[in-house]
Amino acid sequence: MKIALLEPIGVSKEVIDELSAPITEKGHEFVYYDTKTTDPAELAKRSEGCDIVMIANNPYPTEVVEKADALKMLSVAFTGIDHIGTDKCKEKNIMICNAAGYSNQTVAELIIGMAIDALRHVVKADGLVRNGGTSAGLGGKEICGRTVGIIGLGQIGLMAAKLFQAFGAKVIAYSRSESEEAKALGIEYKSLEEVLSTSDIVSLNLPLNAETRGFLSADKIALMNENTIFINCARGPIVDNEALAKALNDGKLGYACVDVFDMEPPIPADYPLLQAKNTLLTPHQAFISEESMVRRAKIVFDNVTAYLDGKPVNVCKL
């Protein structure tokens, strides 16, 4: 079979060579493209004749899937698959396997870091020092004793909950299903309305799909109060980000830490959150660490090996 990795996945060429060796040793052809492209024509060209294609979070739209005549399987070095033309994959019986779980610790740690910055004004303090300022007026609060609301208690949400508990926070959660592990940890399940209205810190950790797109609408954002810290390291389109920016500018929401937007960075200059007050914005980096990139690469190659062995793993439901 012909197998192609269409873009870099955050590890060195040496790691790619090591991970691809079991594939080529079985007689399969492996091609690696070390540059990213979002051009559908170039993606189609790179996919030509490939039985298996490996991608990360670059779009792989319907028009590319349509032209990939030999394609049987997509191994995605990412958790979400909303950047792929999944309907066309389903129509063509193309299997998609993802890399769920590779970044749980990495994302959860950034969530904690964002909460600390929002409470202790770390970025603002850095700017003050560099401009001759002092700590006067910085103040700050502790995570300990705060109520943290987790919306979506999957693997990342649960990991974040454990870290918040380690700091001494009380954790409540809204989730589609309830976990015995979470209950054993003392996490209390509440209604969405109660989580939003009673939490000092709200962390959004839902996947993006047809049901969650636009989930956190203006009326739900309004349930949070003027002191609430809102953190989104999940997916941008889950939130009405224009309403989020308005709530911040109107003083109806305390602070927002956002790693994901309605588009991938670079973000257009007129995007509402860029003009919003009391924000910490990061360029979709929550999943990136040295450790998570190595885990991700291994999973995406293991997915290919398992498929070639007739025992596919991490198969996404389409």
Spell out what each predicted region is.
Residues M1-C50, I172:
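N-terminal glycine-/charge-rich "phosphate-binding" loop or analogous flexible N-terminal tail
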Residues T62-V65, E178-P272:
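Rossmann-like adenosine-cofactor binding region
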Residues K92-I94, A100-T147, K162, A166, ...:
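Phosphate-binding beta-alpha-beta segment of Rossmann-like dinucleotide-binding domains, i.e.
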Residues I96, N227-I229, C233-L318:
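Rossmann-like dinucleotide-binding domain for NAD(H)/NADP(H)
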Residues L153-G154:
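Glycine-rich Rossmann-fold phosphate-binding loop(s) that bind the pyrophosphate
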Residues G157-L158:
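N-terminal Rossmann-fold NAD(P) dinucleotide-binding loop
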Residues A166-K183:
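NAD(P)-binding Rossmann-fold cofactor-contacting core
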